[in-house]
Amino acid sequence: MYANALVCLNPSFIKLQFHIVCTMNIIGIVTLALCSAASAADEGAAYNLQRAPDYFESFVENYNKNYTSDWEKNKRYSIFKDNLHEINAKNGNATDGPTATYKINKFSDLSKSELIAKFTGLSIPERVSNFCKTIILNQPPDKGPLHFDWREQNKVTSIKNQGACGACWAFATLASVESQFAMRHNRLIDLSEQQLIDCDSVDMGCNGGLLHTAFEEIMRMGGVQTELDYPFVGRNRRCGLDRHRPYVVSLVGCYRYVMVNEEKLKDLLRAVGPIPMAIDAADIVNYYRGVISSCENNGLNHAVLLVGYGVENGVPYWVFKNTWGDDWGENGYFRVRQNVNACGMVNDLASTAVLA
């Protein structure tokens, strides 16, 4: 019956129908392929480098990028394409295996050197004091739990965003003080990074600083005000402390720790709370999620906060709080493999403060 009906149809109509069906199928296949590629890229799979211009235009739109000239846009596109190559290489790295993935993010039009210069900020001031007492932790590590995370006890404040102000040192320092305050008073407060940026006479504001010198400067100033009383503006200014507004936290001392191995860091973390630490941030720029196993260790340039540790699929990891906003990494956090000095995390001495 269907054969007879087909014979009765006008041949030109049949040709038209066939053309429409084929065209729709082709469009569907192409659309599916493009969507699949985009979805795979979002999940950290390989980016199709032939589609780099499309990825870049989407990136510009998604992150509201504005370039001052065609020359600048072309330069950013070139860097963006280089970063795609690196992301693909990292996602195919057998060292990290399936544990860490990388993807396009808001930094993907910046070179590593540009990002380190603008969005980190760990550096050595010309004048370096050292009032913090050094403690050597040479006892064998305790047999503590395999998993521990201060976030689960509501002792870690929200993710901050330092922007293009190189004051990671202030953010990491105060994040640890905020956690110690929460451990003592069972409530979270946001302290003023801008106060340290403006009023710390040793460190260099948005041009860099160190963790232990920040603790020392807090002691010299007498304390820290809240973020509400002295809000963040992300640039260097003259010190604008209002002496009529109270310091909510004061410090009476600080410590720096020498440890025989990373395992001892677990004991310290559980005992004193989240710990500010120095790292090399070059390899975490395009991080998306998972545990980083392979991370550069070519010089410390960024400060972050150690908040926990655990094991995933047999891989032991550390959890760090970053200061690049909650739209980066795992909602603002990242994880690295334990016991490999990932990102140079144990190159410098860990520091903590003592609340008054």
From Swiss-Prot:
Here the disulfide bonds are C165-C206, C199-C239, C295-C343
**PROSITE patterns to which the protein is assigned, alphabetical:** THIOL_PROTEASE_ASN, THIOL_PROTEASE_CYS, THIOL_PROTEASE_HIS
Please list every transmembrane segment annotated in the UniProt record, as residue ranges.
none
User: Which residue positions are annotated as catalytic?
Assistant: C168, H302, N322
Per its UniProt entry, which superkingdom is the organism in?
Viruses
A Gene Ontology biological process noted in the UniProt record is:
proteolysis
Q: Which SUPFAM superfamilies match?
A: Cysteine proteinases
EC numbers, comma separated: 3.4.22.50
Q: What is the uppermost EC class here? A: hydrolase
What are the alphabetically sorted keywords of the record? Disulfide bond, Hydrolase, Protease, Signal, Thiol protease, Zymogen
Catalysed reaction(s) here are:
Endopeptidase of broad specificity, hydrolyzing substrates of both cathepsin L and cathepsin B
- Entry keyword Transmembrane helix: no
Query: Its biological function?
Result: Cysteine protease that plays an essential role in host liquefaction to facilitate horizontal transmission of the virus. May participate in the degradation of foreign protein expressed by the baculovirus system.
Record protein name field: Viral cathepsin
Q: Which organism is it from?
A: Lymantria dispar multicapsid nuclear polyhedrosis virus (LdMNPV)
